[in-house]
Regions:
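N-terminal strand-loop-strand
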Residues: 1-28, 41, 56
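Short active-site-proximal "capping" loops at secondary-structure junctions
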Residues: 17-19, 64-68
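Unchanged
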Residues: 34-58, 66-124
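Charged phosphate-binding loop/patch that engages nucleotide di/tri-phosphates or the phosphate backbone
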Residues: 123-150
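A structural microfeature
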Residues: 12, 61-64
Length: 150
């Protein structure tokens, strides 16, 4: 999900593939699978708390969709993803404790709030790769309906 704080910064998780450390690290949006009985909104709230340490957010609409295939930690993934917009009603410095799964403990290195300018200026590797460009319209309230397939 795209979790934005009151300053318009996006929460990203720094990760690497523990099966391929030579591939380097990247910054990604928090998220994960939808568990049985969950809606995509409930899954986003759970993942935001687990990965980001954010207890409260206002869930918004699905803004992007994507189909991805990748290998991670020795597993092959082929999945359809929905990406919600979430508004975190506090400044970005207020991150609580994470509740990570075992593979996340091995893969996640850091978490922080990024401005679009920081992402554009620093050549920061992100997933999705065009994240900084995609965020521009979202920050100005230009959220497409139906969602954009990225």
């Amino acid at each position: 999900m795209v979790a934005l704080d009151t300053d318009g910064r996006v929460l990203l998780i720094k990760a690497h593939d523990p099966a391929r450390p030579e591939a380097g690290s990247w910054w990604e949006l928090p998220g994960g699978g939808i568990e049985r009985g969950e809606t995509s909104e409930h899954a986003c709230m759970r993942e935001l708390a687990e990965e980001g340490g954010v207890a409260h957010a206002e869930m918004g609409p699905i803004i992007w969709t994507q189909h991805v295939t990748f290998d991670f930690a020795g597993w092959h993934f082929d999945q359809d993803e929905v990406i919600h917009l979430a508004r975190v009603p506090v400044g970005g410095e207020e991150l609580g404790a994470q509740r990570l799964e075992a593979f996340e403990v091995m893969a996640f290195e850091d978490r922080r709030w990024w401005s679009v300018a920081e992402l554009l200026d620093g050549g920061v590797p992100t997933l999705p790769p065009a994240l900084a460009d995609l965020l521009g319209p979202v920050l100005t309230g230009d959220v497409a309906s139906p969602p954009i397939d990225i």
